[in-house]
């Protein structure tokens, strides 16, 4: 095939005319491009000016400078300031032979991990403090298997005024076997004699003081037994409606039975079946009984607003182990702070009309400083700084610090956890803290702090080398009367 070539038949004159036309076209195109560029620049400038003239004005953010002050540094007092107070074990000399029975035979049932309550009170009104030890007993299914297991009862000891106690349980009306948990003392019938309320796994018990060293069971008449399948822990008498008689708040723990316990089946590696946290047990509601003034109570738990449900599951939330009745804002009406195990703590503010509002979260008491729940158990309150600030102390599980919530100066219903700055946090972290108690042990006018400690598992060291089954109590001395001007120091 021949290659195509340009047509050479055109004359030279025609070629010159074509080149002239091309040159004129290039000039026109160049001029058009130049004016297009000018127009584009003009439009950009005009658009920029228009945008800045008509754009929405930004809201002015007012910046306020503020000075953030660090917490006041706590000065740990020198050793010479901490009193060298000694305590002596006098149980045997005092004549106390009570032995607690948790009913354990090897099944590792959760109630067995709880110690029962104890109360100092003057039951015979002779001017000295007597002692009541609440007791557990053997489980009924174990008694059927082993008839040699004899039921055990609580122990009542009368103080002779000379530091010696006499066991007067037999014949007192308290020599009854049931799986007891906690105890509350109060004169519910206003006859001048202290009465007894015992919480339990199963039905709770009310005992009216007859004044002759004997008590009678008035649970049925008083209508305060609670549910047969409930597990109640702590309780407190308090006059919630300011009518002159004592009402009754009762903490309930978890929904429990032997069958449920085995379904949960908590185990530890290297140990096997073990006592564990209540995480996988369903929660419950606390109970509130209003004293009607005639020896009877009315259950107002539902109408009082204390039945708190999980926002996520709508199931009962409470897993309560401790309660402290206290007038938080000093308005003349008693409120309740409730220590919950692995769910947030409750603060029930008295609304002065027979109902309460729950404000654990917004008060600052519900959680730790990181917004997490803890294994809260024992609870007590005190104005340990000797001023208007209220302290709420709560004993928590192992590897969790004591909580020491302190009310703020400008809002008595707002608390911050000052456990670290007050000196009780780091030293208490390792221990598993069941009971907690404010008292002035050295009589210097400042409330000190005691915790009662111990682990659930006898073989816990196999799993956690830092833990032990037996743990000593821990005593913190209030340094308020020293140059430190506050805080606590561990007493060795």
Question: What are the roles of these predicted feature ranges?
Answer:
Residues 1-492:
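Acidic, glycine/proline-rich Ca2+-coordinating loop motifs
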């Amino acid at each position: 095939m021949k290659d195509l070539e340009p047509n050479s038949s055109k004359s030279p004159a025609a070629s010159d005319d074509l080149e002239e036309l091309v040159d004129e076209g290039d000039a026109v195109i160049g001029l058009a491009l130049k004016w297009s560029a000018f127009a584009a620049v003009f439009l950009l400038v005009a658009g920029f000016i228009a945008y800045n003239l008509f754009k929405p004005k930004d809201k002015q953010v007012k910046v306020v400078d503020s000075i953030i002050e660090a917490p006041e540094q706590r000065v740990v007092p020198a050793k010479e300031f901490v009193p060298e107070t000694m305590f002596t074990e006098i149980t045997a000399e005092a004549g106390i032979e009570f032995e607690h029975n948790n009913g354990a035979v090897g099944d590792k049932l959760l109630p067995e991990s709880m110690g029962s309550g104890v109360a100092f009170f003057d039951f015979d009104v002779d001017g000295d403090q007597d002692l009541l030890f609440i007791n557990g007993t053997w489980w009924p299914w174990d008694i059927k298997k082993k008839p040699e297991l004899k039921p055990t009862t609580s122990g009542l000891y009368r103080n002779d005024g000379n530091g010696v106690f006499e066991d007067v349980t037999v014949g007192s009306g308290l020599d009854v076997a049931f799986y007891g948990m906690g105890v509350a003392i109060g004169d519910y019938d206003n006859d001048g004699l202290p009465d007894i309320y015992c919480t339990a796994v199963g039905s709770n018990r009310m005992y009216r003081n007859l004044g002759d060293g004997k008590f009678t069971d008035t649970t049925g008449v008083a209508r305060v037994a609670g549910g047969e399948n409930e597990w109640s822990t702590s309780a407190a008498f308090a006059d919630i409606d300011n009518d002159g008689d004592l009402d009754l708040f009762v903490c309930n723990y978890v929904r429990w039975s032997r069958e449920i316990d085995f379904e949960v089946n908590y185990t530890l590696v290297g140990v096997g079946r073990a006592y564990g946290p209540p995480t996988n047990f369903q929660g419950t509601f606390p109970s509130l009984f209003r004293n009607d003034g005639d020896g009877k109570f009315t259950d107002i738990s539902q109408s009082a607003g204390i039945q708190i449900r999980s926002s996520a599951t709508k199931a009962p939330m409470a897993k309560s182990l401790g309660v402290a009745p206290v007038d938080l804002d000093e308005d003349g009406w008693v409120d309740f702070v409730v220590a919950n195990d692995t769910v947030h703590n409750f603060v029930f503010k008295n609304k002065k009309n027979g109902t309460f509002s729950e404000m654990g979260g917004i008060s600052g008491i519900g959680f730790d400083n990181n917004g997490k729940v803890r294994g809260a158990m024992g609870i007590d309150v005190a104005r340990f700084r000797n001023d208007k600030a209220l302290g709420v102390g709560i004993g928590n599980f192992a590897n969790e610090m004591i909580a020491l919530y302190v009310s703020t100066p400008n809002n008595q219903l707002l608390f911050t956890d000052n456990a670290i700055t007050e000196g009780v946090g780091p030293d208490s972290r390792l221990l598993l803290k069941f009971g907690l108690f404010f008292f002035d042990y050295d009589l210097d006018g400042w409330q000190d702090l005691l915790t009662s400690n111990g682990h659930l598992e006898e073989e816990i060291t196999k799993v956690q080398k830092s833990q032990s089954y037996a743990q000593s109590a821990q005593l913190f001395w209030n340094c308020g009367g020293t140059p430190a001007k506050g805080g606590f120091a561990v007493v060795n």
